[in-house]
Amino acid sequence: MDKVTPRYNSGIQRSKGILELAAALYDTSLSRLVTRGGTAVPQINSRLGAGISLRLDTQMVTPTDGELALSFGVDGLRRNLMQVAEKQLSLVWVNPNASLALAYKGCAPFPGPLPLRAIAVFPSWDATVIAVHESTGITSLEQIRERRIPLRVTTRETIKPPFDEDATMFAVNTIINAAGFSLDDICAWGGSVQAVPRPSHPDRSDAIRKGAIDAIFDEGVLSWGQFALERGFRILPVEGAVRERVMAAGYDMITLTPGRIPGLKAPVSSVDFSGWPMIVHADMADDVAYALCEAIEARKLAIPTDNFRPLDLAQLCTIDEETPRGAPLHPGAERFYRERGYLRR
């Protein structure tokens, strides 16, 4: 008798097929190849949104035979991480690791320490920085408040404070508040704020090129840093009392170097925005966390990376400058990495 190739049951066939279809849509005519603003670096943009809310429900109203219902989310800050803590979401994948660190420590915008764990931290090196044009004469963050300088700022979409659903704006706000001012203060002093949806948006690079802005408050510094530095901008160090306040708020620091950002004249300290953690509840069953890691391994060639290198599972469970970890590994994930030889310590 010929060997029969097993296949998924009909319901799973449709569910799995929809997931494959959704992923493939980013490789269709709905997407287009562009370049990052002000650079020749290719980047794919799509008419499809980047937000996702996904539920894998059980096939029966009452789960049988150990069936699981899993739900997934991407990005966000307070709401999504709170939903994982409240077991309304099974997993959320966010940028950056700082969001997980704030939640695990119980720092604002969270009400207290949340029972969260990481199953993986995907590599991404980044920083949130405050950069100003040399023509402003500004060399420190405190000078902006002291001189009440009417800066023309470009930053991200400026949702209303306290910015607790936007990791970028929450970090920016933490830095400038630690220095004693806000975006509203800048506007009150006669300045202005340009909001762009992403760090490399062409509206920003055009404004830099035309001299229409003199300050940049954002992350994604690898996408715009060199371009801005070559046109007279400098990155202000987060140091002294400002640094202490930012770290007390739950953030870690990172050193930017000329090796990372061409055009930088000397190392400068700023706020770490590295790492993309996949986050689950501390109480998730070990076998489910283990299986999630198995799935990452099975699809490692298909999962995009931010560091332009093939996905390395050993890096996902190892703390380094691209993969800081704001909460411990889930025990099920740790067992997977040890058994497969990815985690040796």
Residue ranges and their predicted role:
Residues 111-128, 261-270:
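A structural signal for short loop-to-beta-strand junctions that line the ligand-binding cleft
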Residues 86, 114, 125-127, 148, ...:
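Extracytoplasmic
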Residues 263, 267-345:
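Segments of small-molecule ligand-sensing domains
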Residues 49, 89, 149, 173, ...:
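Sec-exported extracytoplasmic/periplasmic mature domains
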